[in-house]
């Protein structure tokens, strides 16, 4: 009861303007809006894209007004949670934006073979096909949201003075990833391998698809567009993966893996919290997530490795940007 009272206690000095992470979202919204207008004739779903931005504005304004009516910890939490919920709109929007650029999967698939001598996304799940292993790495992959949300909730409850900073770093990492995805259109193995044929991939042939994905009327539920999800089809976590995949997957956002980069950010924040139980509890899931990205064919292994690097950079740079 005492904690709930603390949540609803009116702040002594309410903020009048936007939170730092809301300013980041607004900057991304306005920058991509200019991009849409500049490429209007080349983008097939401009109405949908404008709708996404309208929804983001309305949600942000509504939660800001709610906070102004009752400025307290609870309404701060709702403002941050609102921005996290909007990620479900921003992610598929990157596919609509990067339609103006040619696909680059042939380059990344070639790099993958040069580095590893094979396509890890093709070989890994064939070699390690055991149901228990499939469920483990799939569990790691779908733990993505619980990891960064869990760290955010921990900061809100036990490190409130650092809550806004932690969520600023997490959410801004997403938006920086989205900028990369717009200008670096890589669909990933599940879409590229299906488009060019697994037999070509196995033979080391990586055709340049140019604007193939840009010209699609993509439907995530249509099996002609992607490989079937690998792994133990009757497993609980496989079904969870199917649900999340069908909810909004698009042929975009492969390099670098935002699953890995945001998880790296979350793990740094978990360590920074000085609660070692939090860090060690989440670490096995983070490791499994790394391997799960290319086990389920969402990414090339180089995407996951790049995610380690980008996540470390995001954490270091954004932590200092927030302090400034």
Spans of model-derived segments:
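Membrane-interfacial catalytic/cofactor-binding modules of polytopic membrane enzymes
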Residues: 183-272
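Alpha-helical transmembrane segments and their membrane-interface exit regions
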Residues: 55-63, 84-88, 174, 288-289, ...
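Hydrophobic alpha-helical transmembrane segments
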Residues: 54-59, 140-151, 254-266
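Structural signal for the C-terminal ends of transmembrane alpha-helices
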Residues: 62-72, 153-161, 270-274, 316-321
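N-terminal transmembrane-helix/juxtamembrane module of multi-pass inner/ER membrane proteins
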Residues: 2-55, 74-148, 186
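Membrane-embedded catalytic cores of phosphoryl/pyrophosphoryl-handling enzymes
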Residues: 231-324
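Aromatic-anchored segments of alpha-helical transmembrane domains
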Residues: 29-37, 86-91, 174-182, 286-295
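Interfacial segments of alpha-helical transmembrane regions
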Residues: 77-81, 149-184, 190-207
């Amino acid at each position: 009861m005492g904690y709930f009272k603390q949540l609803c206690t009116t702040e002594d000095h309410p903020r009048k303007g936007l939170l730092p992470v809301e300013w980041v979202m607004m900057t991304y919204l306005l920058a991509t809006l200019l991009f849409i207008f500049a490429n209007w004739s080349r983008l097939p779903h401009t109405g949908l894209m404008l709708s996404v931005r309208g929804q983001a504005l309305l949600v942000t304004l509504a939660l800001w007004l709610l906070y102004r009516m009752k400025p307290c910890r609870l309404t701060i939490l709702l403002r941050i949670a609102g921005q996290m919920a909007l990620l479900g709109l921003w992610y598929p929007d990157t596919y609509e934006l990067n339609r103006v650029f040619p696909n680059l999967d042939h380059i990344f698939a070639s790099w993958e073979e040069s580095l590893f001598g094979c396509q890890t996304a093709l070989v890994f799940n064939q070699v390690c096909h055991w149901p228990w292993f499939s469920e483990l790495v799939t569990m790691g992959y779908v733990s993505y949201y619980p990891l960064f949300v869990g760290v955010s909730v921990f900061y809100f409850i036990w490190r409130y003075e650092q809550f806004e900073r932690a969520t600023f770093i997490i959410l801004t990492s997403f938006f920086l990833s989205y900028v990369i995805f717009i200008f670096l259109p890589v669909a990933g193995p599940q879409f590229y391998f299906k488009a060019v044929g697994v037999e070509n991939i196995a033979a080391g042939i990586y055709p340049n698809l140019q604007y193939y994905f840009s010209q699609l009327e993509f439907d995530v539920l249509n099996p002609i567009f992607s490989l079937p999800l690998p792994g133990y089809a009757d497993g609980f976590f496989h079904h969870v993966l199917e649900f999340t995949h069908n909810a909004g997957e698009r042929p975009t956002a492969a390099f670098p893996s935002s699953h890995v980069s945001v998880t790296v950010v979350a793990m740094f924040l978990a360590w920074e919290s000085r609660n070692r139980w939090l860090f060690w509890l989440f670490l096995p899931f983070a490791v499994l997530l790394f391997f799960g990205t290319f086990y389920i064919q969402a990414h090339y292994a180089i995407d996951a490795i790049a995610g380690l690097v980008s996540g470390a950079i995001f954490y270091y740079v954004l932590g200092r940007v927030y302090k400034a």
